[in-house]
Design a protein with these regions (language model features):
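TRNA-recognition modules of translation machinery and tRNA-sensing kinases, especially anticodon-binding
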Residues: 92-391
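N-terminal alpha-helical targeting/anchoring segments
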Residues: 1-97, 115
Length: 391
C-alpha cells in the first residue's frame, strides 16, 4: 500500500508537470515561438506517465484482491475468542423437553411415519437431500406461512419473492464471493444459486442512493437455499440438519447507521417470537470474534433444543454488518444536508424452516410415534391435532 501511495504521488507530479508544459506549448505557439523542447519533454513524460500508470493499476488490483478477502471488523461488544467454545450464552428460554420414554431422532420419526424419504432423494439427487411427504410436507408449508404472516403482519416486514439465481456482483456485495465460492453452486451460464435470500434481499439496495427518510427498509422472504457444504464432510450426515437444499424465511434490514444497533436487537426479538409461539425451548448466544461470519460485525445465534442430540442446535443467526456490505455493493443514503454515506445492513433467519420442522418432530413426539401439532400451527394444518403413525 505504501508503494502504491508513493506511485500515485509521483504520477500526480508528472501529470502536473505535463499539464504545465502543455500550457507553455500553447502560449509559445500562439506567439510564434519555438516549442520543440517542450514538445519533446511532454513526449518523454507521456512514456513515464504510462509506465507509472501501469504499475499503479497493477498495485491497485493487488490491493483490491487482498481487501476482498479481509473480513469485517468485530464490534466492540463482540466477545474475544478463537472458536465457538468462547461464544457466550446470554439467554435461555423455556424448559428442556422431558419424556417418559427414550425420544427418537427426527429422521427416525419421519421414516416411521412414512413421510420422510432420504433414500429416494439420494437416488435422484445424491446425499444431503430429503423428500417430505403428506403431512410433513404440509407441516413445512404451514411453518413457512406462519413465519411469513408473523413477520409481515406483526413485525412490519415487506414480503419479497426474489430470484434464486444471482450474478457474481450480488454475492460479492454480501461477502460470499470471492472467498467462499467452494460452498456455492454455480450454473454453466455463470449464475449462482443463492445460499441464503440475504443475498437478493440486501442487493435490492445495491448501487442506490436512498433518501434517508425512506429508511428503514425491512424485507422478508421464503426461498430455497443451496449450499455445497464443502467444509462439512462427515458432519451431520444423517437427517435434515445439514442439507444441500433447504427452505428458510429470511429477514433483512437496511437502516441509517445510527439505527443499526437497535435494529439488531429488534431483529433478534422478531426471530425469537417464532420459537416462543411454537413453544420450543431455545437459547441465545453471542458469537465470539473467532466464530463470526465474514461480513458480520456482531452476531446472535438462536439455538433450539434437540432431545435426540441432548443439546441446542442453531436455528437462526442474526447479524449486524454495519457498512461492510453496503460499501461493497455501493448502497448509500442521502442525508438532509445532502451528504451521501453508506447505509447499514442486517440479516437474520426468521427462521430456518427445516430445522423448525425437525425441532417440532423431536420436541412434540409421543411414545406411539405420533407428533402433536403446536397450537399456533393448527389453523395452517386443517385444525388437526396430531400427525399419526400410518395415518
Amino acid at each position: 500500500y505504501d508503494k502504491y501511495v508513493v506511485l500515485l504521488s509521483n504520477l500526480q507530479k508528472l501529470q502536473n508537470e505535463r499539464n504545465n508544459l502543455s500550457k507553455n506549448i500553447g502560449i509559445k505557439k500562439s506567439s510564434g515561438e519555438d516549442a520543440s523542447e517542450e514538445i519533446k519533454a511532454v513526449s518523454e513524460l507521456k512514456t513515464s506517465i504510462n509506465s507509472l500508470q501501469d504499475d499503479s493499476n497493477s498495485l491497485e488490483e493487488n490491493i483490491k484482491t487482498i481487501l476482498e478477502v479481509i473480513p469485517n471488523m468485530p464490534s466492540d461488544d463482540t466477545p474475544e475468542g478463537k472458536d465457538e467454545a468462547s461464544n457466550k450464552v446470554i439467554k435461555v428460554h423455556g424448559d428442556i423437553t422431558s419424556f417418559s420414554f427414550s425420544p427418537l431422532s427426527h429422521d427416525k420419526l419421519g421414516f416411521n411415519l412414512g413421510m420422510m424419504d432420504f433414500d429416494k432423494a439420494s437416488e435422484m439427487s445424491g446425499a444431503r437431500f430429503v423428500i417430505l411427504k403428506d403431512k410433513l410436507a404440509l407441516l413445512e408449508r404451514a411453518l413457512s406461512n406462519f413465519m411469513l404472516n408473523i413477520h409481515t403482519q406483526k413485525h412490519g416486514y415487506t414480503e419479497i419473492s426474489p430470484p434464486s439465481l444471482v450474478r457474481d456482483s450480488a454475492l460479492f456485495g454480501t461477502g460470499q464471493l470471492p472467498k467462499f465460492s467452494d460452498d456455492l453452486f454455480q450454473t454453466t451460464s455463470g449464475h449462482w444459486l443463492i445460499p441464503t435470500s440475504e443475498v437478493p434481499l440486501t442487493n435490492i439496495a445495491s448501487n442506490e442512493i436512498i433518501n434517508k427518510d425512506l429508511l428503514p427498509f425491512r424485507f422478508t422472504s421464503l426461498t430455497s437455499c443451496f449450499r455445497s457444504e464443502a467444509g462439512s464432510a462427515g458432519q451431520d450426515t444423517k437427517g435434515m440438519i445439514r442439507l444441500h437444499e433447504f427452505k428458510k424465511v429470511e429477514l433483512v434490514s437496511i437502516v441509517k447507521p445510527n439505527d443499526s444497533s437497535g435494529e439488531h436487537e429488534r431483529m433478534l426479538q422478531c426471530a425469537e417470537e417464532i420459537l416462543k409461539q411454537l413453544e420450543l425451548p431455545y437459547r441465545v448466544v453471542i458469537l465470539c470474534t473467532g466464530d463470526l461470519g465474514f461480513s458480520a460485525a456482531k452476531t446472535y445465534d438462536i439455538e433450539v433444543w434437540l432431545p435426540s442430540q441432548n443439546k441446542y442446535r442453531e436455528i437462526s443467526s442474526c447479524s449486524n454488518c454495519n457498512a461492510f456490505q453496503s460499501k461493497r455493493m455501493k448502497a448509500r443514503m442521502r442525508s438532509s444536508e445532502n451528504n451521501i454515506e453508506s447505509v447499514h445492513t442486517l440479516n437474520g433467519s426468521g427462521v430456518a424452516v427445516g430445522r423448525a420442522l425437525l425441532a417440532i418432530l423431536e420436541n412434540y413426539q409421543n411414545k406411539d410415534g405420533s407428533i402433536d401439532i403446536p397450537t399456533v400451527l393448527k389453523p395452517y394444518m386443517n385444525n388437526m391435532d396430531k400427525i399419526k403413525l400410518n395415518e
